[in-house]
Amino acid sequence: MSKLKLNDVNIYYGDFHAVQNVNLEVPARSVTAFIGPSGCGKSTVLRSINRMHEVIPGAYVEGEILLDGENIYGPKIDPVAVRNTIGMVFQKANPFPTMSIEDNVVAGLRLSGEKNKKKLKEVAEQSLRGANLWEEVKDRLDKPGGGLSGGQQQRLCIARAIAVKPEVLLMDEPCSALDPISTLAVEDLIHELKEEFTIVIVTHNMQQAARVSDQTAFYSLEATGKPGRLVELGPTKKIFENPDNKETEDYISGRFG
């Protein structure tokens, strides 16, 4: 059963056609990796899945993006509700630096009106455990989130994202600023999170895509200034070992990109 489905998706920034005719399905409780050279549109597609690209003036989408069969761009759909259901973890960890670790985790819940202190504490612990961070921070929950290491901050942001109980988690190069040990911790976490969430990750690290994902989507573009496009989508093992498209094979083998 597909959790997400993109039908003939075209993305524009004003007059610029950024991404052309993307069709893909994302199965529930799986990890899908988006790979491809810089400028190919993979992060643009990712951000369109929870309407984050709309914060840029002039950006718009043609086609359908379906979550459980419902178009998230439908006329009666609230973008804020979409972002609660489809969470996002960014490339650079972005905790609220002066806010306590606990308050960082429950910031989204508080914003949506939750005031029950007992529930907030329970959700904070549950989410920190879910992000494999609880044991490292349980004795300093009142300390600022900005005081954590880079890897811990990224896991704190993941805890904050899952605290509002999304159904889908989008990750835009979540390990690009992390050291190898912290990267491994986040990758292990991704494997655990897919038991509960549907995950889509953009990564420039081909080995990471091979390690963490169930299926891989390879994006490319004909030339600078041309729209990005989805070249090939398939099971990760097949994409990396026996792709159907020569362009995919050339990228995977390092002959371009």
UniProtKB/Swiss-Prot annotation:
Subcellular location: Cell membrane
One Pfam assignment: ABC_tran
Domain ABC transporter per the UniProt entry, residue ranges: 4-252
UniProt-listed SMART domains: AAA (SM00382)
Gene Ontology cellular-component annotations: plasma membrane
Enzyme Commission code: 7.3.2.1
Broad class of the protein's primary localization: membrane
Top EC group: translocase
Role according to the record: Part of the ABC transporter complex PstSACB involved in phosphate import. Responsible for energy coupling to the transport system.
NCBIfam families per UniProt: 3a0107s01c2 (TIGR00972)
Oligomeric form and interacting partners: The complex is composed of two ATP-binding proteins (PstB), two transmembrane proteins (PstC and PstA) and a solute-binding protein (PstS).
Protein name per UniProt: Phosphate import ATP-binding protein PstB
Lineage: Bacteria, Bacillati, Actinomycetota, Actinomycetes, Mycobacteriales
Underlying gene: pstB
